[in-house]
């Protein structure tokens, strides 16, 4: 590469403009400028010291300028943006008036925000000795005179640069300063120059007025590096706009505004395209002569379903409900009304879907003492539960809880026969592996409440809670981190006579996010923390410390092994003037930093980082005592693992900004930093060698206090294997920044750090040799008082480093420290591409209370192959008196569940780990498929299948592009995926039936893991743009049995021009993928549904049925049955397309009766709610019934009773009493209007319910009866007074004054509750699920009753609650009575279940290859047979670095004519040979004896081998024999000969020693 002479010395008047080619697109390199001398090649740069004024980092680009004599190489490397460049951008002109030569040239841009790139030439006939290329590094203001300076930012396209100087002191000039037009330089003129600078494209926004009505942004195209966006703001307001909303088959709302052209006065049109909605239901209420309010659901038409609610006009009948199960997906209700003259009950048929189980509850009395639920066997999907309510109350009950191997909780109550007075026995059987925990509370002389967990017995763990009987001690909490996923707490109680604090050990999981805190001063009065956004796993928090208060503060930061930062502030007591102390505890493994804040005369808060000692770094935060400067932050990336911040403060008299350098880690490199002190003046980072993504850096911190220099870090990559760091330090008098060059390898290394103590005075890092693993040894001084010396050197710890590599087996190497102390490192290499034919390895590291590190390898049990788990237990700092148990559950690729109990090794006591490996559902022998759906601006749906490249196997990606803003002119496709109990994936395409066009549905059935004994049916309903309802039944294909899918397509409100397609994917228990296309039936056009059934991993014995119901714009119901394809059996899918309909609503309202009374009654859904209006003076009654209500009954609530329950609640009685009573779900609640003076009643009822309520009567009484789905007194599966699993829990309320009772019940229960009685008593009682809850209102003076029922409520009942009772339980609670009573009842299901350990050990080393051979001979009839045994043992190392012992055993019978020997070899290697699994099979080898008997001879058999690849990771080995024995009378005999015998006579036996040459040739 060279720069050619481009101006002759005689061309003094030539002025030309350089134009750059428009195809330059690459990015601008970083670094300093390069000086290029005329005629020099790039390799000459470094050899010429006189030309080395500026660092040589990048080369001049290559392009053809206007003058063809000038050529610059590699122009694309210079430009800073990826866009075509207009030649008009490079027309700036530099004019030089004088004619002297110059050795160097610099230039400064017009402004710091220039946006153009300038290439200039000039009129001078002189030549510049050098051309300087600038890069964006340093911005120079105008008229700056600096030799060899850099230039960043470009000049304006129209700028003219003029150098007009009269100095004659230098010829040729050494420096030329080129400034803007009109400026004059102070140095010698003028050279020939070329200046090339680029900056990114900028965007300019222009706001203009236009006669439209909507503010619009018009985006311009890039021109000359600038994009001009025009924002049109309406300048007139005399018109509005018209919004036209349409539906389309997309997934997002599209808005298009059509502005006025300039002279219209009408409204502007805005088109809004919204996705097709789900079906809209309109309800009409009519009267009929029946006795039950019935909802008749109309067929869908154009997206709307009109439901007719029949309200009884007579009340003299009841009704009979018959509930049955069916295979649909929605609950169907059919009411058979009276014809007009019947007096018997009306029949209501309720069909509920399988596999959901319908439970009917019947309540009967019995002479026992405990409310018991007897669950009947399911019949046709219905379970009849009988609730036995005690009719006598003189006994208690005894609960016996045991575990058994079933899957549901069994409760058996042995009632009294009638005359007993003792307790009734309730037997509760809970399933394994769920563990039942029984808690016993005892007193002990300690100071901390401690839970002692007993050993499990038959599924039950008895926990003993020790409550301190003395209160004179405190406790000390020690929190450490460990690599588990849950928090472990261990309390060491007193033995009985101590008075000191009790120790509580808390082990918390290591965190994943590192938070760095920077402290700055500000003129406020409150310390504030500003949390930054996370970047690369790091969150930078800024703590603003007030500078206007009269005290400071001292922050002491220590590390602990928790996962969150703990901050404790010790405030002043009132008269101190010294600093306040703030204790900050930050989590490990981040280095612990202690921060001290001092004032200094600078302008920026600076953190000076001290050298680390014993895991602690003391940072000094300098807070400015003056506030007149700002600061400039420069952020760069580097290859470390933490964010480094360096602040260059002022020396005391500057007024400009202070510079803060922030170096953030690159995301792909992990860097470990060690800080040591040294006698220099600049903080220096020495990067150690390493590979595999871990690099250790040593930071040299000056031990002197001169910090007046900054530094510039330049990081580049190179092809070496270690990181090289070069620091150009100052010689002593410079004030500019120091340059640090860091060259990092393209592939980094894994570094393991071992910490030991030594007798020096500085913490030193010794880096080991490079390789796959680099071991750094950190020496910590223990003999110098200037450092914090650890009291003990930790021994026996283990550090595990896991890296990926391209092999096929997991390799584990244990690096043991030398000497007797230090960390043991376990390096685990796991394959990056896993072959499913071998065993995967998962390493789980847990902490335990022993003293040694225990490692156990857990292999899968049974016949499974798959993941092997290596459990590493590392000691914690606590010595426990008993054995803890930690359970770790991992997934692996096997087919059976494997459980291994890992006990501590050696003499340690402590934690026992139970490892449970559960099979995953992925079969690794086939290719996974991932589907990615994106939107694009095309008009058709594009599908591309991306298969893995090369020889890889694995995931295939299907990319589906769907149009976004384009009206669909072709067939839309909707994919619905459902699970079913088959074994194969079934796919069916459901197209619209009849003449409908619109959406096509693809139904994909994927297998589940359940084995079905009968045919399941899954119904999938989708909408499409047709006009008729289309139903298709998708049955499993092939020989599969399992789920059948019914696909129902219902019309939407839009008529499409073509056929939409909806895809429904379901699983089933078949073995093949079944695809069926479901078209609409009848004359409808619209959605076609494609049903795809995919097999599951379970083989079902019969065909399941899945029903899919979809809506479409047709007029008929279309049904298609989709069976599985191929030989699969399993799920059959029935696709039903139902039309939508549009209707109107009839909503009658009955007014209130009384004086000034108002009644509002809205009724929605299916309900029976008779209401009596309010009667009285100034009475107001609001009665609203809606599907969602305030006193909502929800299956989820806070004092929730979930599932099926009977809960009777008696309201509060007393003075100024307040009762909160909520009812939710399906209930019977009649309501009687309020009666009285100034009474107000609000009554809202929703869902299907009958809710009678008695209004408030009296003076000053207030009753709030609210039931909501979510509430404050919530019941949750994990709760404060939580009862989980199967339990019997009786609670007696507190007695006192001002009593408060919180009582929540959930799951299937019977919970009668007696209200609170007393003075100022408050009772909160919530009931939810399917219940019968009569409520008696409050009695008092001036009563106001608000009775609200809503789907979501404040006092909600939810399946997750605070005082929650989960599962099946019997919980009787007596309300609070008396004065100041408080009741808290907590039961939890969280337990520790120890398991008897099984000790397993594994050892590393070499495997042994056993080769067995059998010699079979053909015996000559009539001859004597002598058995001869041959044993050959060979030990060696094969080409795969596998040590083995090769043994051959055979038995030979003599005399013989034919000797046949067979060999079978299996080789197991201690390290993986490349990426293949090698085994071998020897072919049979035979040798023939040509005469009989055999005579004496001698010789050696030689064997050769050939290895052949058979295409499936197995090698076939074939061995051949050559040569033989010679001697005796038969010199031509081949085969086996006796080693010694008399000449010419038979032998009784022979001894044969064979030299076997074992040759393995690797491919």
Curated annotation (Swiss-Prot):
Renumbered residue ranges of the record's region 13 X 22 AA approximate tandem repeats: 1141-1397
Region feature 8 X 44 AA approximate tandem repeats, mapped onto this chain: 826-1140
Membrane-topology annotation of the record: Lipid-anchor; GPI-anchor
Region (Disordered): 1135-1393
Propeptide residue span(s): 1540-1563
Segments of this protein annotated with the region 8 X 78 AA approximate tandem repeats: 203-825
MF-aspect GO terms: cell adhesion mediator activity
Signal peptide: 1-27
Effect of a null allele: Abolishes adhesion and invasive growth.
Keywords: Cell membrane, Glycoprotein, GPI-anchor, Lipoprotein, Membrane, Repeat, Signal
Lipidation (GPI-anchor amidated serine): 1539
GO CC annotations on file: external side of plasma membrane
Domain of life: Eukaryota
Subcellular location: Cell membrane
GO biological process terms on file: galactose-specific flocculation
Sequence repeat start-end pairs: 203-280, 281-358, 359-436, 437-514, 515-592, 593-670, 671-750, 751-825, 826-869, 870-913, 914-957, 958-1001, 1002-1045, 1046-1089, 1090-1133, 1134-1140, 1141-1162, 1163-1184, 1185-1200, 1201-1221, 1223-1244, 1245-1266, 1267-1282, 1283-1304, 1305-1326, 1327-1348, 1349-1364, 1365-1386, 1387-1397
UniProt record similarity statement: Belongs to the mam3/map4 family.
Task of the protein: Galactose-specific adhesion protein essential for non-sexual flocculation and filamentous growth. Required for adhesion and filamentous growth through recognition of galactose residues on cell surface glycoconjugates. Induces flocculation when overexpressed.
Protein name listed in UniProt: Galactose-specific cell agglutination protein gsf2
């Amino acid at each position: 590469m060279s720069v050619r002479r481009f101006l002759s010395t005689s061309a003094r008047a030539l002025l030309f403009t350089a134009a750059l080619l428009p195809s330059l697109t690459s990015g601008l390199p970083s670094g300093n400028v390069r000086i290029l001398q005329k005629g020099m090649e790039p390799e000459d740069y470094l050899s010429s010291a006189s030309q080395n004024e500026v660092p040589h980092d990048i080369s001049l680009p290559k392009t053809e300028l206007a003058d063809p004599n000038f050529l610059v190489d590699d122009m694309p490397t210079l430009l800073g943006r990826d866009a075509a460049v207009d030649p008009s951008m490079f027309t700036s002109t530099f004019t030089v008036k004088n004619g002297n030569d110059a050795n160097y040239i610099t230039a400064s841009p017009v402004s710091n925000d220039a946006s153009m790139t300038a290439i200039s030439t000039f009129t001078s006939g002189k030549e510049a000795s050098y051309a300087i290329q600038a890069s964006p590094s340093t911005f120079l203001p105008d008229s700056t005179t600096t030799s060899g300076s850099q230039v960043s930012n470009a000049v304006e396209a129209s700028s003219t640069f003029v150098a007009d100087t009269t100095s004659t002191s230098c010829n040729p000039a050494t420096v030329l300063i080129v400034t803007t037009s009109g400026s004059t330089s102070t140095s010698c003129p003028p050279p020939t120059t070329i200046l090339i600078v680029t900056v990114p494209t900028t965007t300019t926004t222009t706001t203009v007025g236009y006669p439209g009505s909507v503010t619009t942004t018009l985006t311009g195209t890039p021109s000359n590096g600038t994009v001009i966006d025009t924002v049109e703001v309406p300048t007139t307001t005399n018109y509005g706009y018209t919004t036209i909303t349409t539906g389309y088959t997309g997934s997002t709302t599209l808005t298009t505004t059509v502005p006025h052209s300039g002279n219209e006065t009408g409204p502007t049109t805005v088109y809004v395209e919204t996705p097709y909605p789900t079906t809209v239901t309109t309800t009409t209420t009519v009267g009929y002569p029946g006795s039950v309010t019935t909802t008749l659901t109309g067929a869908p038409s154009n997206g709307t379903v009109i439901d007719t609610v029949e309200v009884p006009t007579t009340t003299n009948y009841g009704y009979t409900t018959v509930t049955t199960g069916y295979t649909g997906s929605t609950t169907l209700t059919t009411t058979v009304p009276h014809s007009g003259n019947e007096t018997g009950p009306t029949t209501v048929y309720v069909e509920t879907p399988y596999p959901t189980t319908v439970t009917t509850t019947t309540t009967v009395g019995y002479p026992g003492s405990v409310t018991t639920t007897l669950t009947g066997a399911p019949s046709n999907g219905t379970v009849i539960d009988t609730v036995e309510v005690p009719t006598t109350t003189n006994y208690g009950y005894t609960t016996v809880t045991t575990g058994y191997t079933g899957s549901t909780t069994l409760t058996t109550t042995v009632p009294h026969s009638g005359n007993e007075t003792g307790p009734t026995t309730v037997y509760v059987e809970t399933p394994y592996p769920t563990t039942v925990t029984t808690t016993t509370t005892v007193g002990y002389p300690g100071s901390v409440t401690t839970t002692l967990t007993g050993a499990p017995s038959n599924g039950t763990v008895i926990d003993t809670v020790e409550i301190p009987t003395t209160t004179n001690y405190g406790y000390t909490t020690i929190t450490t981190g460990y690599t588990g996923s849950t928090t472990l707490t261990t309390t060491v109680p007193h033995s009985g006579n101590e008075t000191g604090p009790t120790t509580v050990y808390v082990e918390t999981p290591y965190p994943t996010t590192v938070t760095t805190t920077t402290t700055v001063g500000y003129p406020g009065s409150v310390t504030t923390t500003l949390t930054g956004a996370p970047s690369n796993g790091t969150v930078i928090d800024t703590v603003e410390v007030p500078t206007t208060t009269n005290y400071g503060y001292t922050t002491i930061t220590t590390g602990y092994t928790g996962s969150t930062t703990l901050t404790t502030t010790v405030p002043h007591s009132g008269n101190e003037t010294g600093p306040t102390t703030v204790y900050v505890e930050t989590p490990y493994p981040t280095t612990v930093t202690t921060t001290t804040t001092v004032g200094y005369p600078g302008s920026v808060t600076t953190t000076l980082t001290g050298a680390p000692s014993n895991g602690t770094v003391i940072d000094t935060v300098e807070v400015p005592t003056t506030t007149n400067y700002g600061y400039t932050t420069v952020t760069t990336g580097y290859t470390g693992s933490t964010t480094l911040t360096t602040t260059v403060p002022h020396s005391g008299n500057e007024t400009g900004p202070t510079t803060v350098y922030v170096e953030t880690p690159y995301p792909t490199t992990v860097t470990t930093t060690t800080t040591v002190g040294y006698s220099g003046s600049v903080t220096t980072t020495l990067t150690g060698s390493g590979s595999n993504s871990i690099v250790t850096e040593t930071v040299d911190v000056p031990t002197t206090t001169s910090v007046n220099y900054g530094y510039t870090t330049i990081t580049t990559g190179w092809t070496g294997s270690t990181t090289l760091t070069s620091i150009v330090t100052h010689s002593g008098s410079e004030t500019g920044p120091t340059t640090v060059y860091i060259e990092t390898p393209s592939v980094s290394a894994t570094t393991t750090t071992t910490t030991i103590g030594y007798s020096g005075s500085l913490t030193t890092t010794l880096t080991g040799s490079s390789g796959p693993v680099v071991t750094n040894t950190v020496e910590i001084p223990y003999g110098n008082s200037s450092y914090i010396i650890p009291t003990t050197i930790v021994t026996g710890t283990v550090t595990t480093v896991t890296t990926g590599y391209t092999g096929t087996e997991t390799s584990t190497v244990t690096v043991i420290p030398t000497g007797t102390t230090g960390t043991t490192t376990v390096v685990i290499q796991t394959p990056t591409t896993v072959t499913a034919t071998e065993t995967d390895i998962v390493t789980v590291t847990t902490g335990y209370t022993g003293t040694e590190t225990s490692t156990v390898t857990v292999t899968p049990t049974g016949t499974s192959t798959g993941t092997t788990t290596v459990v590493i237990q590392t000691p914690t700092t606590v010595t426990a008196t008993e054995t803890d148990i930690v359970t770790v559950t991992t997934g692996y690729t096997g087919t059976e569940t494997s459980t291994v109990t890992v006990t501590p090794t050696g003499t340690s006591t402590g934690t026992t780990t139970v490892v449970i490996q559960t099979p995953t559902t992925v079969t690794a022998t086939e290719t996974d498929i991932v589907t990615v759906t994106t939107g694009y601006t095309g008009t058709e749906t594009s599908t591309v299948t991306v298969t893995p490249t090369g020889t890889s196997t694995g995931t295939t990606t299907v990319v589906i592009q769907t149009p976004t803003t384009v009206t669909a002119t072709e067939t839309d496709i909707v994919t619905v995926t459902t699970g079913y109990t088959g074994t194969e994936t079934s796919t069916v395409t459901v197209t619209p039936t009849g003449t409908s066009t619109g959406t096509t549905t693809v139904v994909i059935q994927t297998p589940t893991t359940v084995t079905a004994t009968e045919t399941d049916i899954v119904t999938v309903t989708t909408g499409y743009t047709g006009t008729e309802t289309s139903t298709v039944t998708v049955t499993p294909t092939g020989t599969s049995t399992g789920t059948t899918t019914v696909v129902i397509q219902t019309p939407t409100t839009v008529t499409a021009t073509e056929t939409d397609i909806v895809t429904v994917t379901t699983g089933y228990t078949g073995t093949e993928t079944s695809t069926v296309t479901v078209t609409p039936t009848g004359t409808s056009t619209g959605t076609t549904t494609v049903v795809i059934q995919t097999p599951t991993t379970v083989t079902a014995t019969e065909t399941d049925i899945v029903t899919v119901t979809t809506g479409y714009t047709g007029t008929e119901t279309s049904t298609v049955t989709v069976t599985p394809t191929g030989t699969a059996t399993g799920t059959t899918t029935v696709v039903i397309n139902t039309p939508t309909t549009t209707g109107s609503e009839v909503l009658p309202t009955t007014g209130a009766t009384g004086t000034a009374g108002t009644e509002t009654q809205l009724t929605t859904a299916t309900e029976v709610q008779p209401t009596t209006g309010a009667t009285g003076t100034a009475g107001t009654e609001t009665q609203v019934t809606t599907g969602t209500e305030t006193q909502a009954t929800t299956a989820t609530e806070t004092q929730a009773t979930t599932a099926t329950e009977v809960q009777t609640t008696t309201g509060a009685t007393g003075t100024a009493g307040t009762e909160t009573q909520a009812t939710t779900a399906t209930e019977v609640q009649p309501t009687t209007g309020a009666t009285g003076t100034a009474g107000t009643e609000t009554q809202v009822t929703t869902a299907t319910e009958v809710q009678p309520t008695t209004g408030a009567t009296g003076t000053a009484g207030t009753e709030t009866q609210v039931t909501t789905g979510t509430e404050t007194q919530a019941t949750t599966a994990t709760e404060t007074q939580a009862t989980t699993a199967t339990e019997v829990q009786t609670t007696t309320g507190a007695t006192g004054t001002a009593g408060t009772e919180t009582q929540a019940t959930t799951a299937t229960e019977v919970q009668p509750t007696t209200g609170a009685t007393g003075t100022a008593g408050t009772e909160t009682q919530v009931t939810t699920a399917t219940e019968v809850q009569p409520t008696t209102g409050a009695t008092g003076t001036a009563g106001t009753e608000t009775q609200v029922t809503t789907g979501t409520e404040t006092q909600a009942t939810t399946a997750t609650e605070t005082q929650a009772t989960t599962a099946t339980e019997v919980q009787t609670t007596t309300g609070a009575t008396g004065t100041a009573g408080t009741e808290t009842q907590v039961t939890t299901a969280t337990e520790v279940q120890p398991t008897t350990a099984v000790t397993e050990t594994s050892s590393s080393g070499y495997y042994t290859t056993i080769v067995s051979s059998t010699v079979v001979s053909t015996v000559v009839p009539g001859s004597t047979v002598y058995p001869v045994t041959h044993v050959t043992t060979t030990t060696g190392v094969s080409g795969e670095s596998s040590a083995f012992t090769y043994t051959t055993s055979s038995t030979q019978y003599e005399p013989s004519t034919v000797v046949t020997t067979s060999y079978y070899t299996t080789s197991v290697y201690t390290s993986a040979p490349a990426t293949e699994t090698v085994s071998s099979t020897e072919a049979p080898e035979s040798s023939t004896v040509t005469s009989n008997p055999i005579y004496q001879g001698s010789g050696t058999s030689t064997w050769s081998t050939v290895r052949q690849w058979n295409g499936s990771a197995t090698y076939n080995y074939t061995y051949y024999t050559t040569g033989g024995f010679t001697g005796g009378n038969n010199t031509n005999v081949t085969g086996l000969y006796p080693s010694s015998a008399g000449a010419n006579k038979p032998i009784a036996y022979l001894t044969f020693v064979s030299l076997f040459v074992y040759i393995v040739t690797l491919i």
